[in-house]
Amino acid sequence: MIGVIDYGLGNIRAFSNIYKSFDIPHRIITQKHELSGIEKIILPGVGAFDDAMKKFNTSGMRNTVEKMVFENKIPILGVCVGLQMLGNSSDEGVEEGLGWIDA
C-alpha cells in the first residue's frame, strides 16, 4: 500500500487520480495513525519551502515517517517541494529541511 502524505500543501488529488486509474492501492494520509500498513511513502509538495516545512512539522507525522523510513526501511519519494524537504535546507527559505539527504 502506498501512502500519500497530506500535510496541507500538495497535489494530493493528482496522485490519487493516477493511482485510481491504474488500480494501484493507496491511501491519503492525514494523521500518523493512518500510516499503519504503508509500504511506500510519497511526500508531495506545492508552494514555498518554508510553508511546507512548517506544515509538515506541525502535522504530527514527522517523527513517525522518519521512524518508518530509517528504522523500518520504508522507501520514500519526495516530489516537487517534497523532494526539497528531504534535504538540509533550501535557498528559497530559512527553515531547516528534514536533513535526510545531504543537500
Outline where the language-model segments fall.
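Cysteine-nucleophile active-site neighborhood
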Residues: 47-103
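Short acidic/histidine-rich motifs immediately flanking catalytic phosphotransfer sites
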Residues: 35-45
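Short acidic low-complexity segments
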Residues: 26-37
